[in-house]
């Protein structure tokens, strides 16, 4: 799953809202992400300490991915951002005004997958705040960044299915064998010779017939004249 810059926070619970920023604690940001936003001033959405990854994913639903995000831009009463890479993004995405309070844009997110604990006696491994020390959100893919993978086609199976059994065709007694090149050459020579000889024979036959006719006529005329 790929996460775009404009991943929408859908909320982990029905009562989730954006908390007001608290004062920085001594020593900088901490590592907590529990009730009351303990120890980390960069986290706006608080989650219960005993919330598991499975429960959090169930709150996200089937259309969103439970994620841990490093950067967050929150929307309050004013949602217009007119400069920088996020110019106008909040206003166009979730609308301007106080109705957008509690929502935000998240960046640098990685998904939180449900994993089977190594030891059944240590369910703490499945707690959300043990897997993510930053902002926990439900992120939805951008349609422009969705990736689809075509099904893998077994080309070997296709070639095997469409391959012609040439050995069976050549061994079949019904189908005649293809003529060799020598036979074709001999047949071509015979046909050429026949085309040359046939007109000559026809001319010879015609000339001999005419000669016999003239001989018969001459003999008859001579016989009549003689009589």
From Swiss-Prot:
Family, as annotated: Belongs to the fungal hydrophobin family.
Pfam families: Hydrophobin
Leader peptide range in chain numbering: 1-18
Induction: Expressed in spores.
Domain of life: Eukaryota
Organism: Penicillium expansum (Blue mold rot fungus)
Keyword Signal: yes
GO molecular function, a single term: structural constituent of cell wall
Phenotypic effect of disruption: Leads to the loss of hydrophobicity and significantly reduces dispersion in both air and water. Disruption of all 7 hydrophobins leads to altered germination kinetics, decreased survival under exposure to extreme cold stress and increased mycotoxins patulin and citrinin production.
Sites carrying sugar chains: 50
Gene: HfbA
UniProt KW keywords: Cell wall, Disulfide bond, Glycoprotein, Secreted, Signal
Function (record text): Aerial growth, conidiation, and dispersal of filamentous fungi in the environment rely upon a capability of their secreting small amphipathic proteins called hydrophobins (HPBs) with low sequence identity. Class I can self-assemble into an outermost layer of rodlet bundles on aerial cell surfaces, conferring cellular hydrophobicity that supports fungal growth, development and dispersal; whereas Class II form highly ordered films at water-air interfaces through intermolecular interactions but contribute nothing to the rodlet structure.
Subcellular location: Secreted; Secreted, Cell wall
GO CC, alphabetical: extracellular region; fungal-type cell wall
Protein name (Swiss-Prot/TrEMBL): Class I hydrophobin A
Keyword Cell membrane appears in the UniProt entry: no
Disulphide bond pairs: 60-138, 68-132, 69-109
